[in-house]
């Protein structure tokens, strides 16, 4: 079996990972451009951990400016087998108040203008996104949250907007009426790219606000979000520590095939593939491309 390496991408308010030991900082070059930050590579209770700050220290990158392809590519190059996204979000449900964590199991993509695939002209691939989140990772996260006494909803639909502006009231009411659970700006195309890279992926959506639909709460603003982020960051650190303590040391095969997503995805014939694109795909798709 393959050794498990847990990747963690920290969103707003999570620029470091408390509890990470034997840390070394490493910058890995990517053919897809510059990733958000250097990787902080270490361990928690003996489990190899690779941490990245999605917005970088000081929050210098907006959601639309993040190079999602480079981020996932360097995670793959660092040997990550399982990837956890810790992300701030707004809530559309009374039962998911600020401070609640949500184990997302579905996504709706409302972004535009972001590169959403490693593949394209010269090497076309179509991976399944029917079930975008690893059920195995969600189970491990749920058990860790329960052990730490962290309020956690075990399912929910995350709608990803482009940003950087927050929702209009009409948008917020539309998403609420459609039954979505939370809203954020970063988990897509991240989840899609993780699937293309055959990395098992799961999101912990950390609720900071009620967006702007709630009649008894003010419209979302950065000042209020930051206050909740501080409390959420402490819980996220405890969650990561407990998850690492109980996480299998050998990578478990994904029950939905996330780690074999490219087995039947690439449709371009070998002789029609663009050599330059194939070269860029060496980390992401080398397992299947090197065989022809």
Q: What is the predicted function of each stretch?
A:
Residues 136, 140-151, 238-246:
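Generic non-transmembrane alpha-helical segments
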Residues 212-260:
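His/Asp/Glu-rich mid-to-C-terminal helical/loop segments that flank catalytic regions of hydrolases
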Residues 81-82, 181, 200:
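Short acidic/polar active-site loop segments enriched in Thr and Asp
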Residues 144-181, 267:
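Active-site/ligand-binding-proximal alpha/beta "capping" segment
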Residues 76-79, 176, 195:
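Non-catalytic positions within long, well-ordered alpha-helices that form the structural scaffold/packing
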Residues 1-130, 286-292:
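Metabolite-binding pocket within alpha/beta catalytic cores that recognizes anionic/polar moieties
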Residues 260-292:
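Acidic, Ser/Thr-rich low-complexity intrinsically disordered segments
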Residues 185-223:
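Zn-dependent metallopeptidase/amidohydrolase metal-coordination segment
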């Amino acid at each position: 079996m393959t050794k498990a390496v847990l990747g963690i991408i920290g969103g707003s308010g999570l620029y470091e990972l408390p509890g990470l030991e034997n840390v070394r900082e490493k910058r890995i070059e990517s053919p897809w451009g510059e990733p958000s930050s250097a990787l902080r590579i270490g361990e928690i209770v003996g489990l190899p951990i690779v941490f990245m700050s999605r917005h970088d220290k000081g929050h210098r990158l907006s959601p639309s400016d993040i190079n999602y392809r480079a981020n996932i590519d360097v995670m793959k190059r660092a040997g990550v087998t399982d990837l956890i996204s810790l992300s701030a979000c707004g809530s559309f449900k009374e039962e998911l108040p600020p401070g609640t964590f949500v184990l997302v199991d579905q996504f709706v993509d409302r972004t535009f203008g972001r590169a959403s695939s490693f593949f394209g002209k010269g090497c076309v691939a179509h991976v399944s996104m029917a079930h975008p989140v690893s059920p195995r990772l969600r189970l491990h996260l749920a058990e860790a949250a329960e052990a730490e006494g962290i309020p956690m909803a075990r399912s929910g639909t995350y709608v990803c907007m482009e940003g950087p502006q927050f929702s209009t009231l009409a948008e917020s009411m539309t998403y609420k009426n459609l039954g979505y659970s939370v809203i954020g700006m970063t988990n897509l195309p991240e989840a899609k790219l993780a699937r293309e890279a055959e990395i098992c992926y799961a999101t912990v959506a950390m609720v900071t606000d009620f967006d702007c639909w709630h009649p008894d709460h003010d419209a979302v603003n950065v000042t209020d979000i930051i206050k909740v982020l501080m409390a959420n960051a402490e819980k996220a650190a405890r969650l990561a520590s407990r998850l690492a303590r109980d996480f299998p040391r050998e990578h478990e095969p994904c029950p939905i095939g996330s780690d074999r997503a490219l087995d039947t995805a690439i449709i371009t014939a070998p002789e029609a593939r663009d050599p330059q694109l194939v070269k860029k795909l060496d980390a992401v798709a080398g397992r299947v491309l090197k065989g022809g």
